[in-house]
């Protein structure tokens, strides 16, 4: 979906590490960003709020009012979730975190992706240090 600066993007599950980072990147690119999470807590909640991004506690149909232009759905959201049901009812365009990252953040850039079950933070720290040494 082609989104213009100023478009409203809502992130369901915004306090996850990757989702919070994506929220900040989207805000930096000129989008209006909001989000919801079951239990927002520091450090992610304070990081997000320091960027001027509103976090709605809990998942509820009213979190999608006023209606955002686009929604990014985190992996934590299940089909029976009240907010997910409202998302389908309102027919708001949506995507997943990985697809949003690919389309709105890393498109047309070289990228190093670090994934897996264990060791991502350590590997990312080491990779950052190595690249900084170049």
Which stretches of residues belong to each language-model region?
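Short acidic-hydrophobic, aromatic-tinged amphipathic segments that line or gate anion-handling sites
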Residues: 55-59, 95
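Phosphate-/polyanion-interacting regions in eukaryotic proteins
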Residues: 44
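Short, ordered loop/turn segments at secondary-structure junctions
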Residues: 38-39, 60, 99-100
